[in-house]
Amino acid sequence: MTTHTPAGGPLGRLSLSRLISRRAQSIDASGIRRVFDLAAKMKDPINLSIGQPDFPVPTVMKEAAKAAIDADRNGYTVTQGIPELLHAIWQHLKLNVGWHGPTDELGAVVTSGTSGGIILAAMALLDEGDEMVIPDPYFVMYNQLGKLTGGTMVRCDTYPDFRMTAERIERCITPRTKAVLLCSPSNPCGTVLSGAELKDIVDLCRRKHVLLISDEIYDEFCFSDARENGKCPSPAQFSDECLLIRGFGKTYGCTGWRLGYVAGPKDIVQEIAKFQQYTYVCAPSMAQWGVVPSFGVDLSPMVADYEKRRQMVVDTFAGITSVPRPGGAFYAFVEVPKRLGMTGQQFIEQAIEHRVLVIPGNVFSSRDTHFRISFATRPDKLAEGLGILRGMMTA
């Protein structure tokens, strides 16, 4: 009797390395997650790395989610999202950016987080060799979208002020460009583009026949000095041909609920919904019901508190190093002073020795010159951590 020897070797345990795809092998684990894992092992760390609000979910949203569970609304929803939430989204977009939907041209789909919306949008748009322009620095998942979809991410260098302007974007556009992915307010820099800058980008994309994707997960975290007419500037105010991606997790402190939405050209939104059918199926049902009343929540006290924390960061490093003033979100992208002769990675390794956790800039960029601070932490802890970082720079 002949025994078959599998390609991975003699009979016995599976050769797992042979089974893992080249796609998976090409993607590194998130540098942010590595810092989170380190924080879990440290005793009393000063954690300035985590990118989620430190305030509780508004009571009205908790009650709505609990009521949905108690009413046995725990099964699948339609892929696009429950009608009640879609209605609330369109009412909000009408007031916020002037979009009147749904129409034959405009559609929306509720997604499993904004990250879910972004990956589904990339899947719907990119074929092998297609290009998408992303900012550098970028949110960590942006740079991996090419490996996940077969497309190519073209990094738009925004140093030193971290403003992704039309002039900078145009240098990156080629005949293979399908889309420009913009994030304002941005992660990791907190940059908020002005209405004039956004209109220039809208005009550029229209002229080049390129789709503008606007990741606005932090749109409610826009500080008073960056708001225009009381709102966070958005390219959607100038065009209904951009793809708008927003969410609830960062805004209302419910990041674990995994809920966002994509709105924009209906033909593209329908393709995103099709991919959702075969991946996430639908966004979490009880979370959808939970956020229906969210648009009526007053966030101004929380945003004002974060604006004060922003000022703590800016004041700490004034005259010591370069920190472009964040206009929103809850991050600052801090340059390691050149006189120290250190990379961002080397600096954060020393910070860890002082119990301070920040994220090295090379997680978000092709450069290794900066680090990201999250000021979404208690003011006393923030002050302690900032004092240590300042001391490291001035020692």
Model regions and ranges:
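Conserved AMP-binding/adenylate-forming core of the ANL superfamily
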Residues: L85-I89, G113
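Glycine-rich loop-to-alpha-helix module at the N-terminal edge of alpha/beta enzyme cores
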Residues: V35, D72-G75, A88-H92, V97
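Intrinsically disordered, tyrosine-centered linear signaling motifs in cytosolic regions
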Residues: G75-Y76, Y218
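Short beta-strand to alpha-helix junction loop
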Residues: Q80-G81
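PLP-dependent class I/II
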Residues: T2-D28, F36-M42, I46, I50-A68, ...
